[in-house]
């Protein structure tokens, strides 16, 4: 378990607000949740409102990796490693992430996380383009993310993350996406060594249209156990 930050308790709340557009479909997402930062677990519920009304026009899974994998304070870090993310508070931090999908779909997201009392406030924007009309995203054929690893690398005074992730598909098969993320703190912090974060998201649909969703995440950081020659 990471060393504690007096501003971050064992149990914390979260609120979310996202504005975005995917293939010309504008939407807003609001959510709330709670979790245990030092254990690397969290659960949240989200409600999507389409600008033109009606059910969600694409798979919610492409948004879930902004909300989950989207506040790295909820990652279990060992006491031997500086926790870049928890050190950032109460000042806050920003994230920038690009998503490149195997069928040409591309998305970008940016968000700010601030701390108000025992609650993280997560405010984001999301833009996605070039998703094929008959592809897994627009046809809503994805069933959630396979567990994956994020490689964390210190670069130019910030932490950068790289993930090759796979969405699972109805009927079997996978759909590949590459994430690239820049994590920026608003104050200087002690940098960790290069390391990996092992993480898993689980999605539960709360309505048939996909507009209401529950997400849970478990994330653990560690240094590779492979011994150098």
From Swiss-Prot:
Q: For the modification 2,3-didehydrotyrosine, which residues carry it?
A: 69
Keyword terms, alphabetized: Chromophore, Luminescence, Photoprotein
- This chain belongs to which protein, by name? GFP-like fluorescent chromoprotein amFP486
Q: Which organism is it from?
A: Anemonia manjano
Q: Which Gene3D superfamilies match?
A: Green fluorescent protein
Write down the InterPro entries for this protein, in alphabetical order. GFP, GFP-related, Green_fluorescent_prot
Similarity comment: Belongs to the GFP family.
Q: How is it modified after translation?
A: Contains a chromophore consisting of modified amino acid residues. The chromophore is formed by autocatalytic backbone condensation between Xaa-N and Gly-(N+2), and oxidation of Tyr-(N+1) to didehydrotyrosine. Maturation of the chromophore requires nothing other than molecular oxygen. The precise stereochemistry of the tyrosine has not been determined.
Q: Taxonomic classification, please?
A: Eukaryota, Metazoa, Cnidaria, Anthozoa, Hexacorallia
